[in-house]
UniProtKB/Swiss-Prot annotation:
A zinc finger (C4-type) spans 159-186. Component of the mcm2-7 complex (RLF-M). The complex forms a toroidal hexameric ring with the proposed subunit order mcm2-mcm6-mcm4-mcm7-mcm3-mcm5 (By simililarity). Begins to associate with zmcm3, mcm4 and mcm7 into mcm complexes at the neurula stage. May replace mmcm6 in the complex that functions during licensing of DNA replication. A motif (Arginine finger) lies at residues 529-532. Residues 667-680 have a biased composition (Acidic residues). One of its GO terms (biological process) is DNA replication initiation. Keywords: ATP-binding, Cell cycle, DNA replication, DNA-binding, Helicase, Hydrolase, Metal-binding, Nucleotide-binding, Nucleus, Zinc, Zinc-finger. One of its GO terms (molecular function) is ATP binding. ATP binds at G397, D398, P399, S400, T401, A402, K403, S404. This is Zygotic DNA replication licensing factor mcm6-A. InterPro entries: MCM, MCM6, Mcm6_C, MCM_CS, MCM_dom, MCM_lid, MCM_N, MCM_OB. Acts as a component of the mcm2-7 complex (mcm complex) which is the putative replicative helicase essential for 'once per cell cycle' DNA replication initiation and elongation in eukaryotic cells. The active ATPase sites in the mcm2-7 ring are formed through the interaction surfaces of two neighboring subunits such that a critical structure of a conserved arginine finger motif is provided in trans relative to the ATP-binding site of the Walker A box of the adjacent subunit. The six ATPase active sites, however, are likely to contribute differentially to the complex helicase activity. It comes from Xenopus laevis. GO terms for cellular component: MCM complex; nucleus. Residues 691-703 have a biased composition (Low complexity).
Length: 823
């Protein structure tokens, strides 16, 4: 405002230059002296080379360290910190004068100053009105970014009455016209036109930031604030980034409130008829000026930088860091500890116990999650296709098996982890939502959980409770590690380089050992194949285990500090993770051959059907083995994947692929007392009772003579895999008969068909009798306990009107229409 058009009259000029800000002008002079005189540790002028950089057309901001300013002049630094918004334009003029002295600068080029290395950091909750105008540094997570727009900073207006140019009208965060024409003989106050060619514009971007989960007080809703970025600061952060913003808190008019139609007092007086009622009319003195009090707090940032890894930020996944740069960030003591950890022979076990000190047992799950935190090496092919390095883990188990505890531990430990519940999450909440900006009414992308966890871990609890349409939304994020959005005119592909740690409950609440993993979990095949590791936690009754768990829980409740036995502290593990993740191990020839050999074993075993896998073995399992091997190599700070790393990766993968051991089926368990009525349901679960318990169960029923007789002869048992094979054969035959002849088979016909099918395997009459007995018991079990087959019976009516089932010796059999045949 101090640049005045010379054509204006003396009176008008005197009116604009009445007040001089002496403090700000003194700051300008001292700041220019600082830029010209301050010397670095090497004795050279520190900011001279930076000033020469400003000659380039794309550069307009000088970055100044606040620590240097404090060393040079403590009083100047204090004044700038307390009165930043007031002196900021004068500091920018000092930069302009400094740049002019060191190069040929265009006349109309604008310059800005940005400060870094502020000593104190504030939370969003601490941004209150007493801090308005002072220099602050805040740390938060970006949740929404708006497109970059040009912003009118200083306008030149043309008076439409006398054609006088009114220059340098400062814009107060909304379109601001001159209050009156500067021509003394012209009284125009309203009719002005903006001359865009002579006005000054600057790049402008609006960003919404939100408190991080770690800073949030328990049970509170995260606070958010809008940040305004200008000039070189635009496009310096993306949704999901955790950044430090340096700038000042300012108050701006709430444009969305000001632009609400039909509520301004002056417009309502001109509206008549029905529309007048909608506009509410003038409401008297009570409503006068209410719209002019609509202001909001906004943070005007001059500098943005990603959160320093020393304080937690991109700590786990700073891929472009070298060992040397990480070493320089640590103190000597910290570095010695990291080196000592890398030499630890028992590192694998010690890291597991340090990460999950309050969870007893479940060592395999701990190892899998630990390798997930180290991660594999992301790769890119020559065609530009990226191969993910992140490891996805799913934990399936009965209630109270510490599934959610694992997720919570990872969320607290990992600096960039997002915890969400599957039931309460939608597809847009997990990936990204397209929302309308309340001011510009444009559509902008708001980050979801996977975007916020970019370069981190996304913990999803109750994964099986998610709707199918919401599960489909994360297919792309789990394999390609991107999120594609095409909605509301916005087409974008966003990064979601995140590991997914999911917890799911089995169908029906408890894991049924008699069924495969696919039948136990309510997940689609594509989702299951995208998980590298599946861990099954079964709540078994074991006296030794139960005692150990109970002892552990009681210890934790009574002596919390003493009972937690950590080998390394959480900060030490974090530092070690940061250091180990910069290794990019290569696969040696020996290891490559070993991986191929193990994969062939898995495929052959899957095809043979002898030890049936929990799900299909595909190339994804081969990639999983490679990623896990790289994670093991990283953990041991090795530049090469060795066969011992592959061996551990194969062992972990094998644990999750092999189906949970199922006990043999006892075909004699209820033979002596066939259920005459269907109320006897207590025996349905006997197939799942481990060996050695059947005698006790049968003895409870009160049939003492029969149970003694049963104890005398050995019970007829059948391998579970063989039982399923016979069951599938019978179901296929019955369905085939129904489809071809549209008739059902009697029980005896089905038994004869089966015996004929296996006649080549029968050598003696004794074996024939034995096989016939087995098939009879299998059909009996399929009808009465598994409910896979249904007996068709005739009904007769008595005179009383009651139905009585006529028991047939050889009933017709049909397959239960709800039964789905396993692959």
């Amino acid at each position: 405002m101090d640049l005045v058009d010379p054509s204006q009259s003396a009176a008008a000029a005197a009116g604009t230059q009445l007040v001089k800000d002496e403090v700000a002008e003194k700051c300008q002079k001292l700041f220019q002296d600082f830029l010209e005189e301050f010397q670095g540790s090497d004795g050279e002028l520190k900011y001279q080379s930076d000033a020469e950089e400003l000659i380039r057309p794309e550069r307009n901001t000088l970055l100044v360290s606040f620590v240097d300013l404090e060393q040079f002049n403590q009083q100047l630094a204090t004044t700038i910190q307390e009165e930043f918004y007031r002196v900021y334009p004068y500091l920018c003029r000092a930069v302009r004068a400094f740049a002019r002295d060191h190069g040929n600068i265009p006349q109309n080029k604008e310059f800005y100053v940005a400060f870094q290395d502020l000593p104190t950091r504030h939370k969003i909750r601490e941004l209150t009105t007493p801090r308005i105008g002072s220099l602050l540094r805040i740390s938060a997570q970006v949740v929404r970014t708006h497109p970059v727009h040009p912003e009118l900073v200083s306008g030149t207006f043309l008076c439409l009455d006398c054609q006088t140019l009114v220059r340098d009208v400062e814009q107060q965060f909304k379109y601001t016209q001159p209050s009156i024409c500067r021509n003394p003989v012209c009284a125009n106050r309203r009719r002005f036109m903006l001359d865009t060619n002579k006005s000054r514009f600057v790049d402008f971007q609006k960003v919404r930031i939100q408190e991080t989960q770690a800073e949030l007080p328990r049970g509170s809703i995260p606070r958010s604030v809008e940040v305004i970025l200008r000039a070189e600061a635009v496009e310096s952060c993306q949704a999901g980034d955790r950044c430090d913003f340096t700038g000042s808190l300012i108050v701006v008019p709430d444009i969305s409130q000001l632009s609400t139609p039909g509520v301004r007092a002056e417009t309502s007086s001109r509206v008549g008829g029905r529309e007048g009622y909608e506009a509410e009319g003038v409401q008297g003195l009570r409503a006068l000026g209410v719209r002019d009090l609509s202001y909001k707090l906004v943070f005007l940032a001059c500098y943005v930088c990603p959160t320093n890894p020393r304080f937690g930020g991109k700590e786990l996944h700073e891929e472009d860091m070298t060992a040397e740069s990480i070493k320089n960030q640590m103190s000597v003591k910290e570095w010695e500890k990291v080196f000592e950890m890398s030499q630890d022979k028992n590192l694998y076990h010690n890291l597991c116990t340090s990460l999950f000190p309050t969870v007893h047992g479940n060592d395999e799950v701990k190892r899998g999650i630990l390798l997930m935190l180290f991660g594999g090496v992301p790769k890119s092919t020559m065609e530009g296709t990226s191969l993910r390095g992140d490891i996805n883990v799913c934990v399936v188990g009965d209630p109270s098996t510490a599934k959610s505890q694992f997720l919570k531990h990872v969320e607290e430990f990992s600096p960039r982890a997002v915890y969400t519940s599957g039931k309460a999450s939608t597809a847009a909440g997990l990936t990204a939502a397209v929302v309308k900006d309340e001011e510009s009414h444009e559509f902008v992308i708001e980050a979801g959980a996977l975007m916020l966890a970019d370069n981190g871990v996304c913990c999803i609890d109750e994964f099986d409770k998610m709707d199918t349409k919401d599960q489909v939304a994360i297919h792309e994020a789990m394999e390609q590690q991107t999120i594609s959005i095409t909605k509301a005119g916005v087409k974008a592909t966003l990064n979601a380089r995140t590991s997914i740690l999911a917890a799911a409950n089995p169908v029906g609440g408890r894991y049924d050992r008699a069924k495969s993993l696919k039948q136990n979990v309510n997940l689609s095949a594509p989702i299951m194949s995208r998980f590298d590791l599946f861990f099954i936690l079964v709540d078994e009754c074991n006296e030794v285990t139960d005692y150990a768990i109970a002892r552990r829980i009681v210890d934790l409740h009574s002596r919390i500090e003493e009972s937690i036995d950590r080998v390394y502290t959480v900060d030490e593990v974090r530092r070690y993770l940061l250091f180990a993740r910069q290794f990019k191990p290569k696969i040696s020839k020996e290891s490559a051959d070993f991986i191929v050999e193990q994969y062939k074993r898995l495929r052959q075993r899957d095809g043979s059907g002898v030890t049936k896998s929990a799900w299909r073995i595909t190339v994804r399992q081969l990639e999983s083995m490679i990623r896990l091997s790289e994670g093991m190599a990283r953990m041991h700070c090795s530049d090469e994947v060795q066969p011992k790393h592959v061996k551990e990766a194969f062992r972990l993968l094998n644990k999750s692929i092999i189906r949970v051991e199922t006990p043999d089926v006892n075909l004699d368990q209820d033979d002596e007392h066939e259920p005459e009525d269907e109320t006897q349901e207590g025996t349905n679960g006997d197939a799942e009772v481990p060996n050695g318990v059947n005698g006790h169960v049968n003895g409870i029923n009160g049939h003492s003579q029969e149970s003694n007789a049963a104890a005398a002869k050995p019970s007829l048992r059948l391998n579970f895999a063989e039982y399923k094979r016979i069951s599938n054969l019978l179901v296929q035959q019955l369905r085939k008969m129904e489809d071809e002849d549209e008739t059902s088979q009697r029980r005896s016909e089905l038994m004869n068909w089966y015996l004929k099918e296996i006649e080549s395997e029968i050598d003696s009459e004794e074996e024939l009798i034995n096989r016939k007995q087995i098939i009879d018991k299998v059909i009996h079990r399929l009808v009465h306990y598994d409910q896979i087959l249904i007996e068709l019976t005739q009904t007769e009516l008595k005179g009383t009107g009651d139905e009585v089932v006529a028991k047939e010796e050889d009933p017709y059999l049909v397959v239960n229409p709800n039964y789905i045949l396993e692959d």
